[in-house]
Design a protein with these regions (language model features):
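Boundary detector for helix-to-coil junctions that initiate low-complexity/charged tails
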Residues: 1-50
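Glycan-processing catalytic domains of CAZymes
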Residues: 37-433
Length: 433
């Protein structure tokens, strides 16, 4: 474990209030990225002619490169119901008034995706979409095809990020279209992203664009914002309870009282209770004692501390690279995704097909190198067996990060290099004996 990660781990365990921790972190981040603001745009090539020639060949071959595991679309019969796969769904793929104001007219996540460059030979960037192309989620047919593909390959639920800030929503147009059009027949749920909206979209953390108001009144009001959607016949339930996930549970003030209020109002309006998931994102892990029904792991954050870091063993082309590189293959083959403290507790596991946010953060990104569909399949098969044997879980649920987080290199959707291979691996993991 390197010193930076060790200090981060210690910081989040210090017994200070979440608000104070966030404030201290914000000050640190602002100073850190003020000093590094120019680093992201600096390209200082290594002095190795042979390596630069190999890099040039790698870049030129990327236009037509297809991996040996590449798969074309394949129709399947109904998938086995041996596990429920819930995939996170990002709606930042259509113009939005806020993004127009902050980044320029027409800016979407595709702007980040298309400008990514490999940081070393063998670094799989840019990740470019396959069949679905650089889609616009305002167009119904695009979402219809996403649903068709997801259901064909065994993805059971879309977990839409819900961005709500004291009455103001962002990235809402695609989700509104889905909610209003019942012909889009896909089970869904919400993950409330209850944190500040910052400049991370462009690869920096400093600068809050929309702040999260962490008042009791704001958190009480939130449940009234989403209750109207709970009666949708497509909304996902766990044991007859309405599923709702909270990304930053530690930011909820007087959490027991707020949760009790949410439950009361939901029962009055819908005739049934909530099933609340608390994400293990940045906080301590005892949320069932605070009123949540369960916790869930969060990839890639949940496994960073036990992963093998290989940053120093990779010859980066840009000497200014200031990110981190982890070994996905080592993590899967040695089952480092098993988080022992979560076993025996009501904590649902998570998985990521891959992870690489250099599209957003350039040479300060985090890369999980050596990710492949066959390794993802091995990991998923193991999780499916696990959730079906764990008596403490109410359902065999696995959270997948993600369906379409292209800017973070975490997606199941078809791309140019692998085609439908990750989706085929998903189907095989669920259906093979």
């Amino acid at each position: 474990m390197n010193t930076k990660r060790m200090l981060k781990n210690i910081f989040w365990k210090i017994p200070l209030s979440p608000a104070l921790k966030d404030g201290l972190r914000a000050k640190y981040v602002q100073k850190k990225f003020e000093s590094e603001s120019k680093v992201q745009d600096v390209i200082e090539c290594i002095d190795d002619d042979e390596e630069l020639r190999e890099y040039s060949k790698y870049i030129l071959s990327s236009v037509t490169r297809k991996d040996k595991q590449h798969q074309n679309y394949e129709m399947h019969d109904d998938s086995k119901g041996n596990a429920t796969l819930i995939a996170y769904f990002l709606t930042q793929y259509s113009p939005d008034n806020h993004n127009d104001e902050w980044w320029g007219r027409g800016t979407t996540e595709w702007n980040n995706v298309s400008k990514a460059v490999p940081q070393f030979v063998g670094h799989r960037q840019p990740n470019l979409p396959g069949e679905l192309g650089f889609y616009d989620l305002r167009i119904k047919e695009n979402m219809m095809r996403q649903i068709e593909i997801a259901q064909n390959y065994g993805v059971d639920v879309f977990n839409f990020y819900y961005y709500w800030f004291a009455g103001e929503r962002i990235l809402e147009k695609p989700l509104n279209m889905f909610l209003e059009d019942k012909s889009l027949k896909m089970p869904f749920m919400f993950c409330w992203a209850n944190e500040n909206w910052t400049k991370r979209f462009s690869g920096t953390d400093e600068g809050i664009l929309i702040g999260m108001e962490n008042s009791e009144e704001n958190y009480r009001q939130f449940i009234h914002e989403v209750i109207p959607y709970f009666s949708d016949e497509r909304y996902f339930n766990v044991q007859g309870k309405i599923a709702l996930q909270i990304y930053r549970p530690e930011l909820i003030p007087n959490v027991e009282e707020i949760i009790a209020y949410w439950r009361k109002e939901t029962i009055v309006a819908c005739g049934k209770d909530l099933y609340l998931f608390a994400c293990q994102s940045k906080s301590g892990f005892a949320w069932c004692a605070k009123g949540f029904d369960a916790e869930n792991e969060w990839m890639q954050g949940s496994i960073r501390m036990q992963a093998k870091e290989i940053t120093g063993h990779i010859k980066k082309i840009n000497k200014s690279f200031a990110g981190e590189i982890f070994d996905y293959e080592d993590m899967v083959l040695n089952k480092k995704y098993v988080i022992k403290r979560n076993l025996g507790r009501k904590v649902y596991p998570a998985i990521m097909p891959s992870w690489d946010n250099t599209a957003r953060r350039n040479n300060r990104g985090t890369i999980w190198h050596n990710s492949r569909p066959d390794l993802y399949k091995q990991w998923l098969k193991d999780l499916i067996q696990s959730v079906n044997s764990r008596k403490e879980l109410d359902m065999p649920i696995i959270f997948v990060n993600a369906w379409n987080e292209w800017g973070e290199g975490a997606y199941l959707e078809p791309d140019r290099e692998y085609g439908f291979a990750y989706l085929q691996a998903t189907w095989e993991a669920k259906n093979e004996e």
